[in-house]
Amino acid sequence: MTTAAAVISPWPLVRQGDQYHPVKTLQYLLRARGHNVTVDGIFGPATNAAVRAFQQQKGLAVDGIVGPNTWSALIITVKQGSQGDAVRGVQEEFQFRNLSGGPGLAVDGIFGPKTDAAVRGFQQALHQDIPSVAIDGIVGPVTWRALVSGMLAL
């Protein structure tokens, strides 16, 4: 059986000068990791400095470019009951992409029943093409990557 990670779209490359998506998700994840950045969707000097600081903390190449290694280190697994900026990042993805549950899903940082239903619906849609995707309501590495890379988008 092919693993989900082998067939899911690659992580996007995000760098200074990029705007809106997936910069807002990046900024929410940086905040969840303790970096003081404004979530404005603009990858400016403050976001660049936070990315470089994060890369240095994690022993990654310090280049200010958010690619596969930085995304993988940055994501935080969230599930029903989770709260905070990582959850806001998930909710932002659903709203931006107008995915199932997205239009009515508040970006409030609370992983409640509506967010859980949206995540499970997304995982179900992925599962149809990639049977190894679990439909468990947990946003771990595979679900994060599918969301951020734009699978099933718009």
Where are the language model's segments positioned?
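Cell-envelope/ECM-targeting effectors and their regulatory/trafficking segments
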Residues: M1-L154
